[in-house]
Amino acid sequence: MTADEEETFTTFNEFRSDTFTVPTRAMVEDGFMNATFGDSVYQEDETTLRLESKMCEITGKPAALFCVSGTMSNQIGLRANLVQPPYSILCDYRAHVFLHEAGGLATLSQAMVHPVRPSNGNYLTFEDVLGNVTYDDDGDIHAAPTKVISLENTLHGIIIPIEEIRKISEFCRENDIRLHLDGARLWNASVATGISIKEYCSYFDSVSLCLSKSLGAPIGSVLVGDEKFIRKANHFKKQSGGGIRQAGIMSAMAIHAIDYNLSKLELSHNYAKQIGDFCQEHGIKLESPVDTSLVFLDLKANKMDPNRLVELGRTKYNVKLMGQRIACHFQLSQESVDNVKKCILECLEYHQKHPHKDDGRNNKKMYSLDAIKK
């Protein structure tokens, strides 16, 4: 057993997000003992350059750019894919770049967003794209042409099949449309499917990969693409206040996360599967399949009050919940996973006797917002 495995984490009962993962002792030691202290804005920090080079090897892309967050790597990545308005970005209606990045596409990219509801209820297909894309040369000047399609894999923990990605990629290349991937949890998709990060990335012009969520680094995301694209993205990074001077400490911890925590993601998938299977066994409806590390309860169908679920978890079961989404990570304890099951079941049994009527107050909370009403 390694030192990391023996370590007890303060996040053992944290189910709100995998962003709550904390650095391990070994990761912190790497950050402060093995980092260089060059200026990364001048591209003179050896550790950051080593991280970016490592990400190029993993993804198969020629260039990489270390950013402070996934929001930044997504937003500057999408902006760097665009040239001259008018233009639009097509994405899933639940996409993080659309709903949860503080309106970045409207401010930084000045882009119209075309959100699409997947016809299968889970992930965008080639047919969904084909039915919603706006062509640049079809003679209709009323709409903003689709210049970027942004996919997210995983989205709500759901894996987009590689066959769909391949077809969408071929379509984009044939129609001069750039294809971006919000791969914040692409690591999870790769671990679950056995498909390499490099193969996934080969179908995209740009990819954003988070180092903080499932991998547990304290900060950071990396944007990858070709060299010209990354040079352009670096301008937008600087413009957005994202230039980091002594980035070596953060980069060293990120390298440690890739080297030592990637193999632990399967544990987070196992925890989520346990919760998902438990829900199915007890007739608790889920919004989507549990492909990886996230479980989404269908609170409306179950007539459950998210506030009661959160409060019950806090006061009786010592678990931290955030309503419908249950996020699993490798720093959880099995006891806490079991407590989440008990908490969900008790909440369901209460609401079977006292059904909760949704008054709409929770509809604008994170991961409950529906921008396209049915």
Curated annotation (Swiss-Prot):
Cofactor(s) this protein cannot do without: pyridoxal 5'-phosphate
Domain of life: Eukaryota
UniProt KW Plastid keyword: no
Gene3D superfamilies per UniProt: Type I PLP-dependent aspartate aminotransferase-like (Major domain)
Catalysed transformations (reactions): L-threonine = acetaldehyde + glycine; L-allo-threonine = acetaldehyde + glycine
Residues covered by region (Disordered): 354-374
Pathway participation: Amino-acid degradation; L-threonine degradation via aldolase pathway; acetaldehyde and glycine from L-threonine: step 1/1
GO biological process, one term: glycine biosynthetic process
Enzyme Commission number(s) of this protein: 4.1.2.48
Gene Ontology annotations for the cellular component aspect, listed alphabetically: cytosol
Residues modified as N6-(pyridoxal phosphate)lysine: K213
SUPFAM superfamilies: PLP-dependent transferases
Pfam family name, one: Beta_elim_lyase
Alphabetical keyword list: Lyase, Pyridoxal phosphate
Top-level EC class as recorded in UniProt: lyase
Gene Ontology MF: a single term: L-allo-threonine aldolase activity
InterPro entries: ArAA_b-elim_lyase/Thr_aldolase, Low_specificity_L-TA-like, PyrdxlP-dep_Trfase, PyrdxlP-dep_Trfase_major
Keyword Lyase belongs to the record: yes
Alphabetized PANTHER family for the sequence: L-THREONINE ALDOLASE, L-THREONINE ALDOLASE-RELATED
Family designation: Belongs to the threonine aldolase family.
Assembly, per entry: Homotetramer.
Protein name: Low-specificity L-threonine aldolase
